[in-house]
Amino acid sequence: MADRTAPRCQLRLEWVYGYRGHQCRNNLYYTAGKEVVYFVAGVGVVYNTREHSQKFFLGHNDDIISLALHPDKTLIATGQVGKEPYICIWNSYNVHTVSILKDVHTHGVACLAFDSDGQHLASVGLDAKNTVCIWDWRKGKLLASATGHSDRIFDISWDPYQPNRMVSCGVKHIKFWTLCGNALTAKRGIFGKTGDLQTILCLACAKEDITYSGALNGDIYVWKGLTLVRTIQGAHSAGIFSLYACEEGFATGGRDGCIRLWDTDFKPITKIDLRETEQGYKGLSIRSVCWKADRLLAGTQDSEIFEVIVRERDKPMLILQGHCEGELWALALHPKKPLAVTGSDDRSVRLWSLADHALIARCNMEEAVRSVSFSPDGSQLALGMKDGSFIVLRVRDMTEVVHIKDRKEVIHEMKFSPDGSYLAVGSNDGPVDVYAVAQRYKKIGECNKSLSFITHIDWSLDSKYLQTNDGAGERLFYKMPSGKPLTSKEEIKGIPWASWTCVRGPEVSGIWPKYTEVIDINSVDANYNSSVLVSGDDFGLVKLFKFPCLKKGAKFRKYVGHSAHVTNVRWSHDFQWVLSTGGADHSVFQWRFIPEAVSNGVLETTPQEGGADSYSEESDSDFSDVPELDSDIEQETQINYDRQVYKEDLPQLKQQSKEKNHAVPFLKREKAPEDSLKLQFIHGYRGYDCRNNLFYTQAGEVVYHIAAVAVVYNRQQHAQRLYLGHDDDILSLTIHPVKDYVATGQVGRDAAVHVWDTQTLKCLSLLKGHHQRGVCALDFSADGKCLVSVGLDDFHSVVFWDWKKGEKIATTRGHKDKIFVVKCNPQHADKLVTVGIKHIKFWQQAGGGFTSKRGSFGSAGKLETMMCVSYGRMEDLVFSGAATGDIFIWKDVLLLKTVKAHDGPVFAMYALDKGFVTGGKDGIVELWDDMFERCLKTYAIKRTALSTSSKGLLLEDNPSIRAITLGHGHILVGTKNGEILEIDKSGPMTLLVQGHMEGEVWGLAAHPLLPICATVSDDKTLRIWELSSQHRMLAVRKLKKGGRCCAFSPDGKALAVGLNDGSFLVVNADTVEDMLSFHHRKEMISDIKFSKDTGKYLAVASHDNFVDIYNVLTSKRVGICKGASSYITHIDWDSRGKLLQVNSGAKEQLFFEAPRGRKHTIRPSEAEKIEWDTWTCVLGPTCEGIWPAHSDVTDVNAANLTKDGSLLATGDDFGFVKLFSYPVKGQHARFKKYVGHSAHVTNVRWLHNDSVLLTVGGADTALMIWTREFVGTQESKLVDSEESDTDAEEDGGYDSDVAREKAIDYTTKIYAVSIREMEGTKPHQQLKEVSMEERPPVSRAAPQPEKLQKNNITKKKKLVEELALDHVFGYRGFDCRNNLHYLNDGADIIFHTAAAGIVQNLSTGSQSFYLEHTDDILCLTVNQHPKYRNVVATSQIGTTPSIHIWDAMTKHTLSMLRCFHTKGVNYINFSATGKLLVSVGVDPEHTITVWRWQEGTKVASRGGHLERIFVVEFRPDSDTQFVSVGVKHMKFWTLAGSALLYKKGVIGSMEAAKMQTMLSVAFGANNLTFTGAINGDVYVWKEHFLIRLVAKAHTGPVFTMYTTLRDGLIVTGGKERPTKEGGAVKLWDQEMKRCRAFQLETGQLVECVRSVCRGKGKILVGTKDGEIIEVGEKSAASNILIDGHMEGEIWGLATHPSKDMFISASNDGTARIWDLADKKLLNKVNLGHAARCAAYSPDGEMVAIGMKNGEFVILLVNTLKVWGKKRDRKSAIQDIRISPDNRFLAVGSSEQTVDFYDLTQGTSLNRIGYCKDIPSFVIQMDFSADSKYIQVSTGAYKRQVHEVPLGKQVTEAMVVEKITWASWTSVLGDEVIGIWPRNADKADVNCACVTHAGLNIVTGDDFGLLKLFDFPCTEKFAKHKRYFGHSAHVTNIRFSSDDKYVVSTGGDDCSVFVWRCL
């Protein structure tokens, strides 16, 4: 029996002993069918307690660790561990997979939870971030994911009463989650003082936002919202592991072994202590509880499951037991009864009944048990222990007979001899000890040759010999009982063995794979009766082999279930069962053995899913006599589709070469040529490695592919239309059921599939991201909605797509060998079949994955390589064509029968309504009936059958057929030789198209006089083609060797051909018969050329580095050109026939003289003057520009110059054909490039009249014919030179505003940094010095004076409880655009500033706010579709910024989109239907993303441009077309499925137009697009071509454009001086031909508009300076609605001492006075310098302002006239104050000084004193109430007090304590230590202000937060309330005079916020 076939018998899993209780929780439930579901190892178990039966789910491939029950109580979700863990959802009735969720988690899936309606599933990963995911599990789609927590999460649960809310808990945390859009956001639970912060182990949600959770200390923590409201103490005395909620209430289970039941309000009902019951024991710990009606389930840490009936709660039933934690190795079966014994590291020995599936006895030992053995009569049991001792027990009462310890190391193997007289014990020390049973186990022998630990031992039948295996892989023999080694081979050979459990030896060598030395098979056991062997290995597999199993790499059957290591396998005494034990999963599996007679070659009727019963992957074949592969198939499997460089790598290469060569001075690059090319016709069809790639379209055209082109061929006109969307070889093609769309798949690193329309040739969808190397098979589903594709990666992945959306529905690994065909089931959209090398599999989609079953051959046939497959008309029939020529007929997965159809493989099959047509390697087409019972007709493809209308010749009779299709009364056939034929049903055949066969094509020559060319290829043929409208092959000749070059003689009569073996021939050009041949060289001939005119000489270049010159007339070699150091690549003659130009592989350009071959050195300048007959060389100064920047990778293979010397065509290794203007001097000339060939373009030639260019591709075998389009006649639809967009020289224009905006770097709050450069220790980190004179606690002294003067003593002291945002002055115009809109027919406007979205009512002026953003908002858009009224989208700066979509009226968030745009989102826009949203980021790639915002799904995403993109807008009538503009950037985008395709704007030859920086977009009818440029022009585009310019629409940049949807009028806004005719806002007609200008009355010299919006008769305008203005269209009157500061930080802020007014002073050089009550600007003054601080005088008459340049001014409030000014300092004035008695002015500066001025002396402002000893710059100053002191806070975090006006520092604490301050704005001092947060290391508290009532202090900080504290605030980290709105820095803050308002100013956001105090 030396065959390697798999055995015909099988195993079926019958029972699993065990339950996983350790490291898991909440994994035990009742199903709807009252069964119990749980898991153990890698198996999901459904246990029916009534019938005592188990069902198994085997879809996992590693340990299951989590389980959730669907609300319908039937579906189960399980999650596993592993490198790529997945989640299965399965049905507990039939244990079938319903859905698979994969490709997201790593390490493992720790928790699972279904939501209350069962639609969504939440999962938590075991990765470092404990990722939380939300799935639409039926679709297998990930909806959202987020970082869970930094530490383990133990439980997650949905809130059943609130949609989209979840709670998770774990190590020291609990989090409350909200799902909105695709954003999953968490808020941490607040433990507060109610309970200790501790680990929460489990939770359940209840009504009214209550959450119950079980804590580590045994308490129940009860939460309301986020806050811990109470604890139920001592619910358990130790950790609560499980909390179960049901209708009746709650059940909890804990580490204390108790179950407690609680009612729905969590009042206790009862308590059950399992430790106290009769099966209980000390240390019992409950991991899982479930309560259903009157029954409870409890799962314990030690793998037991208890069932308790509540009425009889003192009698729990133990319904399942298994071993506890610890490895399980020991297994033995009783020699006479169906009993098994196991022993484990849990120190127990257990006896199991195999017949009853029950534990009958358990015995606890002192030590871990590692091996067991029954004596032959079954009376005694020996146990080997971990400490090296062994124990013998009597079986009947489990009492000890002996306990012997002779060894130190663990005993891993022991066996009694068959006669019962000896016990052999093998230990890890190495020896085997032999003991005599009868002599009370006296040691009588020792076998000690092993150098390593003993793994297995077996006795001979007669008990005289022992064989051992050890850890070193040695197999040794000993005589018994002495232990003498036995070496004689003969003697060993004859020994019959009593048992076979050894893994080494000739009988079991087949269990080891070929060519490996592995040690991962732990155990085997032979069944002599049935000649089978069972094995268990480290991969969790149990396998069946034939026994004996002699040849390595034998086939087997394999069974899954154990997770990691199967430690032991044994047959039962009667061979009915196999038992296997799992190491880490410590479970025991009992398998039923189904002998061959029973299984009778037919697989079980219900093969288990997940390929559980499978023939193993590795052992695909059942038989060893697999025929060798057919040569064609063999050849095909060897093809390698890897590329050194993929097209996708080009941008990177360009980038790298840019970085390397950036030092090169930028010379003017040569211009691209005016003329262009159009691909007209391609000769070729890819048949040699593709199949089923030929179809009729709806219109009766033929569609197929060659190279990177899909061809739609018209039979009547013999013309081709070409789809050129691919950039590398197409490998597969399929047609939509309606026959109008086609899908094609290509080669690539990330291989793409295009779905395109055969009429328009437009790409409808581009599918990427899931295949590597290439896509080798495609098929549409029967309804045409889905597409399935198969990749060329190592696993041949299968991907199922919703192709219109471009989303993958499901994926799976296909097979390890190549898959040739995939087919969708016509009746069931979710079923597929694949065939390939030794493979047929039937697939069923399950959620995001597939389950598969292999074809089961039974006795009807055997496993073959399948080449084609088709579904029949009857429901479950499948027909597959095999490599043997047979057709296999399948029903479901069973093979019914086979039918012989062809000689050699059946490559093609096509199903008809009533039958099939097949084609094979034998070149015969056969028509069959619908069950392959009769062959109705055959057609042999022969030359004699060809009709006269054929467009070519058959290369040979009976070519191998690779594709067949029927339609239009014909059979269409594609052959391996690259021919396409149409067979009429009556017999005649027409050849439509043909090309070269497999092999590279290099040789190409154009006829000197006629439209004819010749090609020669490695396929060993020379072919002559006609190029007129006939496009056909005229002649073909087979050669003995492949050829690489050919050339016509000048008269066109002779044709020279150079071959690969160093020979060449000259043939007659008409008959292609030999004229002469030579063989002078060994290496291949690389180029061959006749000299001009008479063609006297023939030059022959070879890879031997020589060029031979022959005299044609005498047929002799006359000269040899030597001197090249490498192989010759190209040669050209000069026009006199005297000089040869030669290029070599070492990039040498050499010159030789004919006929002798003398070498000449010619200077470049001279060489340029020589007139050459032909130019095919690629070197020299006139070609320098054709080499690309990254030419170290790519080579230019060929070039050819037109006869007039103007146009040079080249072909390169990237598949590009390029046109250059000749001469091509200087580096990197511009060009036009064309795609079509796939990898290498090997040769290019112009036809004799220069009107046509011919190109051949190397491996793609194609001959392409391009027509030259002269400048005038061009169709302008050209892909122009790609390179030109990167040129530095054409900069896109300049404007200071745009330049500044480009340079803004958006950093975020996350990196919050101090806005001031402070130094020193933060106040809350300073150590306090204890002063000597601390007052005694009870002081007899007078009471301390107030800290703060109370201004309004009369009123009741009012405490401020809350702040509410009331109004914002500001609008972000300086770096945003189009961020201002009308709402509600012009009643409201919406805009943004800082982090606030603002809706302002125009009639009342009141504002409402959207404050959910966490940082500056950068963009805002309003949905224009009536269905989504008032829906607004905004987005922001941030490392992971979110887009918020919200309702402008209610301010409800409708959806949140977490983005990939790092740094921020700077533009968003809704599509025409309002359902899609496009966003663009400020990340380095400027990614453009399209979203389906309501679901929160990303539709597509792609890098937009390397520089800033300013605007991206959908066409107002489209959901797929949009336009982006930016820095030198103009792209027209199409959304195709889930891919974004773009066309660059083509400027063409318009005068005065060049690619500018574009700033804005508007749209017109008929596909018109208008873009505003930086120079003030508006460019008008039709499709993507520029058609005209609106010159100088504005004098400066056109920043904004608005298209009015209702009448199509366009508003533009830009930078312009207001004049009579011109203005910064203009209203245009629909075509932008006429306009009307509006002046904005802002008083600025140049107005700069950033945003416009048109309402009814009004235009809303936003300016760069932060104003919002409304302009009437009729009256042209402008009305300022919002006034804000311009760009620049606002630092100065002061509130009026008695009125509701305040002043703000900003770096924009203005000071503005505002009215708090009416919310409006009262007055403003331009100061001429940036202002830093401001202060009112106590009487409110004057205001002092300090400037950044050291100057200060005093203005009169009413007139804002200057009262006085002074400049005594050079650096910024930081704070300024007027004393309460109106006498002194204090001025604090950056020069570490405070200067005092006496105001009573009039406007001279003489300094009367100043403070010295200030350690750093001044930040805040406050006067005392009596004007005698001033407190100064400084940049060194120190506060000092000085006398006024002398400036002397006050150091006595006593004095300072007693001062009453007039105001408090200091952030320093003990009184305010509590305002400093813990996380202030990067950021500071900038400002503070205490209320006039002295009870509260409000602060502003670098995080943009306002915080409200009580005052004084002397405890560190005091409690506070926080308010958002500002973006990064709050610079200053003040209470109004009566504490009604707080005013705060922003740093970066240039906004003033007014808050109401409540």
Curated annotation (Swiss-Prot):
Subcellular locations according to the entry: Cytoplasm, Cytoskeleton
Biased composition (Acidic residues): 615-627
Entry GO CC: cytoplasm; microtubule
Domain of life: Eukaryota
Segments annotated as WD repeats: 59-100, 104-145, 148-187, 195-233, 235-273, 280-321, 323-362, 364-403, 406-445, 561-601, 725-766, 770-811, 814-853, 861-900, 901-940, 996-1035, 1038-1077, 1080-1120, 1191-1230, 1236-1276, 1412-1456, 1460-1501, 1504-1543, 1553-1591, 1593-1638, 1685-1724, 1726-1767, 1768-1807, 1880-1919, 1925-1958
Region described as Disordered: spans on this chain: 604-627, 1322-1352
Chief location bin: cytoplasm
InterPro entries associated with the record: Beta-prop_EML-like_2nd, Beta-prop_EML_1st, HELP, Quinoprotein_ADH-like_sf, WD40/YVTN_repeat-like_dom_sf, WD40_repeat_dom_sf, WD40_rpt, WD_repeat_EMAP
Family, per entry: Belongs to the WD repeat EMAP family.
Job description of the protein: May modify the assembly dynamics of microtubules, such that microtubules are slightly longer, but more dynamic.
Protein name as it appears in the record: Echinoderm microtubule-associated protein-like 6
Organism whose genome encodes this protein: Mus musculus
Lineage per the UniProt record: Eukaryota, Metazoa, Chordata, Craniata, Vertebrata
Gene that encodes the chain: Eml6
